[in-house]
Swiss-Prot record:
Quaternary structure and interacting proteins, as annotated: Component of the RNA degradosome, a multiprotein complex involved in RNA processing and mRNA degradation.
UniProt family annotation: Belongs to the enolase family.
Protein name listed in UniProt: Enolase
Gene: eno
Biological source species: Hamiltonella defensa subsp. Acyrthosiphon pisum (strain 5AT)
Reaction it catalyzes: (2R)-2-phosphoglycerate = phosphoenolpyruvate + H2O
Amino acid sequence: MSKIAKILAREIIDSRGNPTVEVEAHLEGGFIGLAAAPSGASTGSREALELRDGNPARFLGKGVLKAVEAVNGSIAQALLGKDAKDQQHIDQLMIDLDGTENKSHFGANAILAVSLAVAKAGAASKGMPLYEHIAELHGTPGQFSMPLPMMNIINGGEHADNNIDIQEFMIQPVGAKSFKEAVRMGSEVFHHLAKVLKSKNLSTAVGDEGGYAPNLESNAAALETMKEAVEKAGYVLGKDITFAMDCAASEFYNKETNRYELKGEGKTFTSEEFTHFLENLTQKYPIISIEDGLDESDWEGFKYQTQVLGDKIQLVGDDLFVTNTQILKEGIQKKIANSILIKFNQIGSLTETLAAIKMAQEAGYTAIISHRSGETEDATIADLAVGTSAGQIKTGSMSRSDRVAKYNQLIRIEEALGERALFNGLKEVKGQS
């Protein structure tokens, strides 16, 4: 009933108009799983490799026909007749077949899409929702929690065509009593932010992740604008709503000068100076989480940043750790950061993703489930967040259906879980419980 009968891949389009890989996994019992791989814009140098065709005559070189061919050929052949419920075996087969350190032979986009499609088919064969199947794979059967959303309402950096250097300015509806209420609060602030921007004759065009992308005089001006929107929505800043930022500092780090260059403000900083720049912002605004506050290779700088800020706020490693247990283990040993961002496609399989979440949780680090800037309607990360009780999720703003699909799936899951739907809000954030 749960043996794989057919694997079928195709090229589809993501939210940035680029091709990505979608896979159907068909089981003997008639069960089907459908999944698509996301794609990032600001990527860590140690991420698993996304396989692109490189043919400039087609999709500007970004086609994924090679990855599709790998799935429909070698991968499909290897998986036929295998049990879809044995996720670890399926993923290991693909990793071994690929044979490279960074999945560059088949592409992480190919392997991940198969991995997720098989997981969905496996869940269907067990007659259970995906989040329940994931909880079992994670070794925590029957344990679920709803994540606190980190909503990216002002986009900058690589996610927008504006002059803001910091990539994401987020709100967290920590005063909510349920996930559905958190979504409502976020939506209301989002709409009030549009009014605030319009009143200042600023753009309300949106970036890759559905947040507004105005030109502002400084990064602090983004926080000030958000503060105004929160207050106009009738919420108390710091009590009902808190702030979070993703600096994506590797994107404005000059490796030749070892300086962080905020070109939008005309300022440059050393590692220590940039840490204190961020510290100053946390003293002015209720920022309780900062992601990639320094360059991914600046481990000495991160050590200092963790010493300065790590007891007060959540310091999240994204490009720093790239969902990789080997790198995370080193970070834990060296006391660098206190949280990891979890992105399926940075590592390239569900099994390896679950291993990174487990390692973080066992070390007392938080694990934040995240989308990528290039997304599809696939909402698997919603089930991942609930099934691993990760406690936090980043899936963009309150616009663009590729973002909203994840919020809507979480609303459905919360409804299905009923009284079992725990929502811990602020307690899920490192340093805030």
